[in-house]
Amino acid sequence: MTIGLVGRKVGMTRIFTEDGVSIPVTVIEVEANRVTQVKSVETDGYNAIQVTTGAKKASRVTKPEAGHFAKAGVEAGRGLWEFRLNNGETFTVGSELKVDLLADVKMVDVTGTSKGKGFAGTVKRHNFRTQDMTHGNSLSHRAPGSIGQNQTPGRVFKGKKMAGHMGAERVTTQNLELVRVDAERNLLLIKGAVPGATNGNVIVKPAVKA
């Protein structure tokens, strides 16, 4: 199964097993994912479904978005996401995907947008070691050091780890244990931390490496 669910990261807490072991979990709230479009090989070149979730103020919905949602006959949501379909999987526009979709899943992959850290140096961004605090070093404690050679090759190689913008990028954490599916409250409890800030959108899919 390649499809998943779009949810909202609520925060972290812990639950206890029957023998008293504490398990740290991230709580993901999954409101019903409404299917807004079904794509096919004939019309789009590939099979997929497009979903939305949550709600959006009417004043914040653009005219193209309003027309798209009206055509599907669903309430405007806070965004649009897409999941590829395997051969044989069928969905209809307007149908809803809920947490029970993952009821039989043990391990999941969670995708989100990592917390933005702004401009960061190499020590924070790439885990470089710091240089000596003493022994004649007075200015280069957190400097990256050499970034290459001299006239040959006369340039800095692509991919060189340097200071720059850190965070605020799409990140996937794989093989997290899905501890509990609370269908009554539309919650997923996932062991450990997941990418992103509180209230951020996350995509939960069955693990590809499980």
From Swiss-Prot:
GO BP term (any one): translation
Entries under Pfam families matching the protein: Ribosomal_L3
GO MF terms, alphabetically ordered: rRNA binding; structural constituent of ribosome
Modification after translation, per record: Methylated by PrmB.
Chain spans, region Disordered: 134-153
Alphabetical keyword list: Methylation, Ribonucleoprotein, Ribosomal protein, RNA-binding, rRNA-binding
Superkingdom, taxonomy of origin: Bacteria
SUPFAM superfamilies noted in UniProt: Translation proteins
GO CC terms: cytosolic large ribosomal subunit
Modified residues (N5-methylglutamine): 151
Sequence intervals crossing the membrane: none
InterPro entries: Ribosomal_uL3 (IPR000597), Ribosomal_uL3_bac/org-type (IPR019927), Ribosomal_uL3_CS (IPR019926), Transl_B-barrel_sf (IPR009000)
Gene3D superfamilies named in the record: 3.30.160.810, Translation factors
Self-association and partners: Part of the 50S ribosomal subunit. Forms a cluster with proteins L14 and L19.
HAMAP family noted in UniProt: Ribosomal_uL3_B
Function summary: One of the primary rRNA binding proteins, it binds directly near the 3'-end of the 23S rRNA, where it nucleates assembly of the 50S subunit.
Family statement: Belongs to the universal ribosomal protein uL3 family.
The protein, known as: Large ribosomal subunit protein uL3
Organism: Aeromonas salmonicida (strain A449)
